[in-house]
């Protein structure tokens, strides 16, 4: 459950509690509703909503600062091959494969080092965030005759190996805590455009560095949600 969904649910619960209170005040002969208890529940729900709004606002602000700091650190040339976006509370850094990897390989290209060092600095600065490295390919099958593709069966393997290369590069070269890193491959099954043109294929061949607030923080928030179901009578 996302923070936005949790906030929306709490607002619905709050409205239901308020409605119950209004009904009970109109029907003073009703003995099955404890008005003072209902007021307490409304106050608790309202306090929790305010807390969620504060957390979401802080998270959104940190994401924008993170995104802006990274964008400012990148050169004009780098920005042609690196796309930084904030979507639904998550920072997405999309890197073009022709910049990141040696041609037809999953080994990191030397010219990617400077860009990755800037991304690593941002990751190190924001220690309360987890980092998912996600590899994506176009729909062209792997060439099994290429010596660089030895033992690579398909685009699943290639995308996962490329993501793993970035993870290990960040860990080994820049000291990023490996406990914060996850490598994943999505093969050809997460395209952002059609593979019918060369330009489309090029856009789909990308690696995304996805920076998210640690999940356990949000699970703790959800666990603290007030139980209002009993009030909706």
For each of these PLM feature ranges, what is it?
Residues 91-96:
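Short, aliphatic-rich beta-strand segments
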Residues 1-85:
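Extracellular/lumenal/periplasmic "stalk" regions immediately C-terminal to a signal peptide or transmembrane helix
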Residues 100-114, 118, 126, 136-232:
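Periplasmic OmpA-like peptidoglycan-binding domain that tethers envelope proteins to the cell wall
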Residues 47, 54-57, 75, 121-128, ...:
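Sec-exported extracytoplasmic/periplasmic mature domains
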Residues 86-90:
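Short Gly/Ser/Thr- and Asp/Glu-enriched loop/turn motifs at secondary-structure junctions
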Residues 78-80, 84, 116-126:
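Short amphipathic alpha-helices and their capping/turn segments at secondary-structure boundaries
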């Amino acid at each position: 459950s996302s923070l936005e969904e949790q906030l929306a649910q709490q607002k619905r619960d709050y409205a239901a509690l308020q409605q119950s209170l209004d009904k009970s005040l109109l029907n003073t002969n009703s003995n099955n509703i404890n008005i003072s208890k209902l007021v307490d529940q409304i106050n608790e729900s309202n306090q929790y909503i305010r807390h969620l709004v504060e957390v979401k606002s802080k998270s959104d602000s940190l994401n924008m600062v993170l995104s802006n700091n990274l964008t400012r650190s990148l050169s004009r040339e780098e920005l042609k091959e690196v796309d930084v976006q904030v979507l639904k509370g998550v920072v997405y850094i999309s890197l073009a494969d022709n910049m990141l990897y040696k041609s037809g390989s999953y080994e990191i290209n030397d010219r990617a080092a400077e860009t990755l060092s800037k991304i690593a600095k941002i990751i190190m600065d924001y220690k309360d965030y987890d980092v998912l490295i996600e590899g994506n390919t176009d729909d062209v099958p792997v060439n099994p005759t290429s010596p660089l593709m030895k033992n690579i069966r398909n685009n699943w393997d290639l995308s996962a190996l490329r993501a793993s290369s970035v993870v290990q590069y960040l860990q080994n070269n820049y000291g990023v805590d490996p406990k914060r890193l996850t490598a994943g491959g999505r093969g050809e099954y997460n395209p952002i455009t059609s593979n019918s043109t060369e330009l489309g294929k090029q856009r789909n061949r990308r690696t995304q560095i996805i920076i998210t607030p640690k999940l356990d923080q949000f699970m703790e928030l959800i666990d603290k949600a007030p139980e209002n179901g009993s009030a909706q009578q």
